[in-house]
């Protein structure tokens, strides 16, 4: 595989979605992509098939499970969600880095199947800042925010299961650090030996 598979995880409010959106906006699709999940739930207002999700019928999703189509999948309440393995493999074969936006539990599943997956965890600079961001969204009641904070603390205990940790204090700095990880992974000897195979063969020819 020429491209790298990445998992990006974070508690709610850490800025994960903003970082990945900024990364995708700055880099061409020929270099990096976000994996689009399949789901059996109905589209919400503003969601488009093939952009936000691949909206799939229940029976079709279960058929894909039987075919081994998914790298990982889960049933949440009455709906299925899954990550398409063939789509990821096609992108990686083209030298494109692929990001998966999943939680630490999904990361564990994938790590067992893909040992060389690169994992990144985003942390907030403090609990106070995390709570401030959640309140600033203006979407939830104080009770819901308290539950989200409790869940966030639980999720953050798993940061040490990841290869890289980024503290999202200053957004531009965090984005630069995220890009640096991609660059460093691409420059590893094992990666360059594949990407630059023809050049290396020419340079070392007798």
UniProtKB/Swiss-Prot annotation:
Short name of one Pfam family: Guanylate_kin
Keywords carried by this UniProt record: ATP-binding, Cytoplasm, Kinase, Nucleotide-binding, Transferase
Function of the molecule: Essential for recycling GMP and indirectly, cGMP.
Protein's UniProt keywords contain Signal: no
Subcellular location, principal: cytoplasm
SMART domains the record matches: GuKc
Catalysis performed (reactions): GMP + ATP = GDP + ADP
Record GO cellular component, one term: cytosol
Family to which this protein belongs: Belongs to the guanylate kinase family.
Enzyme class: transferase
Binding locations of ATP: 10-17
Lineage, highest ranks first: Bacteria, Pseudomonadati, Pseudomonadota, Gammaproteobacteria, Pasteurellales
E.C. numbers: 2.7.4.8
Keyword Kinase in record: yes
Guanylate kinase-like domain ranges (all copies): 3-183
Subcellular location: Cytoplasm
Protein name: Guanylate kinase
